[in-house]
Amino acid sequence: MKPSHFTEKRFMKKVLGLFLVVVMLASVGVLPTSKVQAAGTTVTSMEYFSPADGPVISKSGVGKASYGFVMPKFNGGSATWNDVYSDVGVNVKVGNNWVDIDQAGGYIYNQNWGHWSDGGFNGYWFTLSATTEIQLYSKANGVKLEYQLVFQNINKTTITAMNPTQGPQITASFTGGAGFTYPTFNNDSAVTYEAVADDLKVYVKPVNSSSWIDIDNNAASGWIYDHNFGQFTDGGGGYWFNVTESINVKLESKTSSANLVYTITFNEPTRNSYVITPYEGTTFTADANGSIGIPLPKIDGGAPIAKELGNFVYQININGQWVDLSNSSQSKFAYSANGYNNMSDANQWGYWADYIYGLWFQPIQENMQIRIGYPLNGQAGGNIGNNFVNYTFIGNPNAPRPDVSDQEDISIGTPTDPAIAGMNLIWQDEFNGTTLDTSKWNYETGYYLNNDPATWGWGNAELQHYTNSTQNVYVQDGKLNIKAMNDSKSFPQDPNRYAQYSSGKINTKDKLSLKYGRVDFRAKLPTGDGVWPALWMLPKDSVYGTWAASGEIDVMEARGRLPGSVSGTIHFGGQWPVNQSSGGDYHFPEGQTFANDYHVYSVVWEEDNIKWYVDGKFFYKVTNQQWYSTAAPNNPNAPFDEPFYLIMNLAVGGNFDGGRTPNASDIPATMQVDYVRVYKEQ
């Protein structure tokens, strides 16, 4: 459960990006990069990586701006950052003198400067409010390379006029993707979005409606930021939308009558028949990773749209018989909704979207025959007849398949007996008393991080304030209850902002911390829109910097509206916004949910890997080859080599589920915890 911040989505990635490629790369551990290993080479020369990476980099912003550049080419390109990092220092010019950045004053690693690592590249980032000169130097040889980071302050202003730079008539793709760059404000191209952002509102309506919808933090309307609309940064930035019907988008000034209306047209095709034909080719060869991507067939000569996807039938030929791909026991394929899961050795498949829709498959090691069918009447379950397109897959026998030898299920204790063979119980709370045991737990209270008004809702836009009241946190009948209630309250940090709900959050900081081991929570979770129960861990000391450079382990998080699944995640990398995460989902067997019974949520944390389980069943693993901390590039286990403490809470709203808010019937909501147990191996 992270202290999240505003996340920008790139329009090209969201709408036109190579979604399949990104999924495939991420699935095989390419994103993010492996951590830096031990170094020993000294720097004999440095040159700028590209013209965009120095010597002069100019940025503008309201009060401050963020800069980043790729590491220079070391030793004529023969040495990498991994080789030379221990020999590279950073100076800042103070007056006319070069001063080590750690001695210059005002520069705090992982707060306003640091390292980044992404996609095989490394570099530096800085957040600055004035033009600054930076010098990289070799500690051994005195080689230097200088950068000038030029800052131009943007003064906030209000909007008097807007003119489109794209549109205002825009046609959405077959998948519903569309977008436009920010307009020209006040008839002056020098007036940026940042200068007027506080004065700008966004409204949406169907083209055949007269009622505008304010989509700012209004998940109840169905418009959820970073889900079906958002902002991108490429080309100066703008807005993106995913639509299923034609809509109008209105940008409007809060302080004047200036507004601009766009029309995004979604052309739903007219089908004269439902005969399908190949989109492009019918023979596909697996790549080095064993992955294959195919576009879905055309229907009556046109690409399918979202509402038609459920009508398709996908089959594989097994020993001369056609078997539904979804019948995993016969097809030997597992559907993966979130991209390739490199913790599973199963053949996997799923959908991708990149202007059109398609399917991905991985790892394909053998040749096989696939066919896709569509009902002749266009209705799900209708007669298909011979309306199939047949595909030939040429497998790659050398494609990697994950090793799952250490992914066996684990034994769990019973509600009355914590004993587990091979494990020592080192801490527990069975909640058998009548009140919360404050020798084991602390209350967290309030609505803001560090009393900063900008961090309302705990930095996540959550809607609850936390209390130490027994109406929100109480022990009854051998269970801990954390209860969210309708209980509006404002705080001195911003008297005009109200937290609509109260709830509970407790932790073991300074009372229990562990470095490696196993944690079991047995809990029953609440359902409801915007209800967000979590069991998680944070570092006792932020040795590697503020979130997420020092790490976070989410044992379990759940979305109340989706009672059939929970997730486990780690957060790592650098301080926001260069943080990274890796996680997986557990799907309950048919007939079970996280709300209809108690389930045991476990994390097993070892020096070089972390694994997640539900009721003893393995569902996800991450290794130290996938995590890192930019503050300790030569430490293979950072940041997960420091003590962490436990946290339990029940949040409402927030960014985890796209800003969704509860219905009236969803509150009160209660998370019940039967026990928390901490083990070490014998």
Swiss-Prot record:
It catalyses: Hydrolysis of (1->3)-beta-D-glucosidic linkages in (1->3)-beta-D-glucans. Pfam families: Glyco_hydro_16. The keyword Hydrolase applies. GO terms for biological process: carbohydrate metabolic process; cell wall organization. Residues 391-682 form the GH16 domain. SUPFAM superfamilies: Concanavalin A-like lectins/glucanases. One of its GO terms (cellular component) is extracellular region. Residues 1-38 form the signal peptide. InterPro entries: ConA-like_dom_sf, GH16, GH16_AS, Glycosyl_Hydrlase_16. The active site is at E552, E557. Keywords: Cell wall biogenesis/degradation, Glycosidase, Hydrolase, Secreted, Signal. GO terms for molecular function: glucan endo-1,3-beta-D-glucosidase activity. Its main location: secreted. It is found in: Secreted. Its EC number is 3.2.1.39. Lysis of cellular walls containing beta-1,3-glucans. Implicated in the defense against fungal pathogens. Belongs to the glycosyl hydrolase 16 family. This is Glucan endo-1,3-beta-glucosidase A1. It comes from Niallia circulans. The gene is glcA.
